[in-house]
Amino acid sequence: MQVILLDKVANLGSLGDQVNVKAGYARNFLVPQGKAVPATKKNVEFFEARRAELEAKLADVLTAAEARATKIKELGSVTIASKAGDEGKLFGSIGTRDIADAVTAAGVDIAKSEVRLPNGVLRTIGEHVVSFQVHSDVFAELNVVVVAEA
């Protein structure tokens, strides 16, 4: 199925590309999320007329994401208190939701889906480097300090 991309899609293309994808991927993911439209004659003409507007909108989103990434980097570190045993192991773990809540409380709005934990959830006290993907092209890193609750 031919579609026109309205946004940058990983491993597929960027704004304005006409790509061939499986029908189910287009119907169930790309079109409902507003990332693509079917490549009919009418849609191709409509897209070409609005191309500059869509590119400007995409640039604005990228600029906003870069500003959020800068705010995250300016935080330096975020401290999270959790119950822990004597050897420094946590009772439970600290996951993406806990980190997103702590960063949001520190003043930068972050969704839990933007938090990236490549080594899995945090299970020990100490400093951990956590990365955030605020846009498909924009990443930020932040130190998360896990301390034992008194």
UniProtKB/Swiss-Prot annotation:
Entry keywords, A to Z: Ribonucleoprotein, Ribosomal protein, RNA-binding, rRNA-binding
GO molecular function ontology, one term from the record: rRNA binding
Similarity comment: Belongs to the bacterial ribosomal protein bL9 family.
UniProt entry tagged with the keyword Ribonucleoprotein: yes
Any Pfam family the entry gives: Ribosomal_L9_C
Organism whose genome encodes this protein: Pectobacterium atrosepticum (strain SCRI 1043 / ATCC BAA-672) (Erwinia carotovora subsp. atroseptica)
GO biological process: translation
Name used for this protein in its record: Large ribosomal subunit protein bL9
Protein function: Binds to the 23S rRNA.
HAMAP family the record matches: Ribosomal_bL9
Top-rank taxon, per record: Bacteria
GO CC annotations on file: ribonucleoprotein complex; ribosome
